[in-house]
């Protein structure tokens, strides 16, 4: 069974990963 804590941690990791990916993509676009 999935626990709220596990979902929260996964969600936080997803947000951080998405933000990091977006920042890296912006860096490549800007050069």
UniProtKB/Swiss-Prot annotation:
GO molecular function, one term: L-malate dehydrogenase (NAD+) activity
InterPro entries associated with the record: NAD(P)-bd_dom_sf
Catalytic reactions on record: (S)-malate + NAD(+) = oxaloacetate + NADH + H(+)
Enzyme Commission code: 1.1.1.37
Keywords on record: NAD, Oxidoreductase, Tricarboxylic acid cycle
Top-level division of the source organism's lineage: Bacteria
Enzyme class: oxidoreductase
GO biological process: tricarboxylic acid cycle
Residues bound to NAD(+): 11-17
Family membership: Belongs to the LDH/MDH superfamily. MDH type 2 family.
Main function: Catalyzes the reversible oxidation of malate to oxaloacetate.
Listed name of the protein: Malate dehydrogenase
Organism taxonomic ancestry: Bacteria, Bacillati, Actinomycetota, Actinomycetes, Kitasatosporales
Gene: mdh
């Amino acid at each position: 069974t999935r626990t709220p804590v596990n979902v929260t941690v996964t969600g936080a990791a997803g947000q951080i990963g998405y933000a990091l990916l977006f920042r890296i993509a912006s860096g490549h676009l800007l050069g």
